[in-house]
A protein has these predicted regions:
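Surface/interface-facing alpha-helical segments and adjacent flexible terminal/loop regions used
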Residues: 1-217
């Protein structure tokens, strides 16, 4: 942390924690559940109901303006189109341009359930954190990691800097770079821009300097 006192103050600020938690909940649902599922549909509708450029709680103005434009353009995309895109991005077999699992980036063999996943699991056990199973996917799936951010914001905010700095942000920027370059729908591109902007701003506000890992993708 660059400024521990400032970080501690923000982590005890109820307004910040509620804003960060709500943002991560909506984004995490959209990036972990099929668009045809009711909860994902509600989360998508909630984001579309917000003036993202003006009222989204975290993110730089340029990124939020871009996200708002993309999400607005994506309003014409139907659930079937979005579901096919979700399956291609998150559930398809074979090599994906942007694998949504952290250890694919940090493990030399580019595999799921790699060493950083094991480290994350050990960290979660040490702090008594449970993560509900999600179709047999590892906990370091990007949407599940956002949902874990939300859980920490509501239950144990002091763990947020370590979680972001050690377990998510060492690889998330590379994921978003590849993810945004592989988009075929405006909706998911907008969600990706919004998620990246939210995490980047939270790290900046909290003074988090992510750990440096060698990335293999």
């Amino acid at each position: 942390l660059e400024d521990r006192d400032a970080s501690d103050d923000l982590l005890s600020d109820r307004g910040f924690l509620e804003a960060f938690g709500s943002a991560c909940t909506l984004l995490g649902i959209c990036l972990s559940q099929r668009p045809i599922e009711k909860e994902a549909s509600r989360a998508r509708s909630a984001i579309r109901s917000v003036d993202v450029a003006r009222d989204w709680p975290l993110g730089g103005s340029d990124a939020l303006a871009l996200a708002a434009d993309l999400i607005a353009r994506g309003a014409e995309e139907d659930e079937r189109t979005l579901d096919l895109e979700f399956q291609r991005l998150f559930r398809g077999t074979g090599m994906r341009a942007a694998a949504p699992f952290g250890s694919v980036y940090t493990d030399r063999d580019q595999v799921m359930y790699g060493w950083t996943w094991m480290e994350l699991r050990a960290w979660m056990r040490m702090h008594g954190i449970e993560c509900a199973s999600c179709e047999n996917e590892p906990e370091d799936q990007i949407g599940r990691m956002l949902l874990l951010c939300a859980a920490l914001a509501s239950r144990d905010s002091a763990l947020i800097p370590e979680f972001l700095g050690r377990h998510l942000m060492p690889w998330a920027p590379r994921f978003f770079e590849l993810f945004l370059g592989d988009m075929r729908t405006s909706t998911f591109k907008g969600l990706g821009v919004l998620a990246q902007a939210t995490l980047d701003d939270a790290c900046a506000l909290l003074g988090i300097v992510p750990a440096r890992f060698r990335l293999y993708r």
